[in-house]
């Protein structure tokens, strides 16, 4: 069984037992989170939401809270001595998908 989940403005296809890196979710390591924005549930029968499947949910456990790899943002002005170098690390949460209801 699989599901298409929407979280953090992105869509992910998940199955039970998968590890999923998503935008930061509130909670501590070991907490259980229930995701309600389910766009589609597949398996023997397929349920497609309009836009959401009303009775479906995905239960996951927070495995890790951390930051992604650093990305560098470099800006410069032509023919000037103006340069900026900035780094950014996006906060992220790693979930282990435990159960798909629906």
From Swiss-Prot:
Name of the protein: Large ribosomal subunit protein bL21
Keywords: Ribonucleoprotein, Ribosomal protein, RNA-binding, rRNA-binding
Subunit structure: Part of the 50S ribosomal subunit. Contacts protein L20.
Gene Ontology terms: cellular component: cytoplasm; ribonucleoprotein complex; ribosome
Biological processes per GO annotation: translation
Gene Ontology terms, MF aspect: rRNA binding; structural constituent of ribosome
Keyword Chloroplast: no
Record bears the keyword Transport: no
Domain of life per record: Bacteria
Record function comment: This protein binds to 23S rRNA in the presence of protein L20.
UniProt-listed InterPro entries: bL21-like, bL21-like_sf, Ribosomal_bL21, Ribosomal_bL21_CS
Similarity comment: Belongs to the bacterial ribosomal protein bL21 family.
HAMAP family in alphabetical order: Ribosomal_bL21
Matches recorded under PANTHER family: 50S RIBOSOMAL PROTEIN L21, LARGE RIBOSOMAL SUBUNIT PROTEIN BL21M
């Amino acid at each position: 069984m699989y599901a298409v989940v929407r979280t953090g403005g992105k869509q992910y296809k998940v199955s039970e037992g998968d590890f999923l890196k998503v935008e930061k979710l509130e909670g501590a390591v070991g907490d259980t989170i229930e995701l309600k924005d389910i766009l589609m549930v597949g398996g023997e029968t397929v349920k497609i939401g309009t836009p959401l499947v009303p009775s479906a949910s995905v239960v996951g456990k927070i495995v890790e809270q951390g930051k992604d790899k650093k990305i560098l943002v470099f800006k410069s002005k032509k023919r000037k001595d103006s340069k900026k170098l900035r780094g950014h690390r996006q906060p992220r949460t790693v979930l282990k998908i435990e159960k798909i209801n629906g």
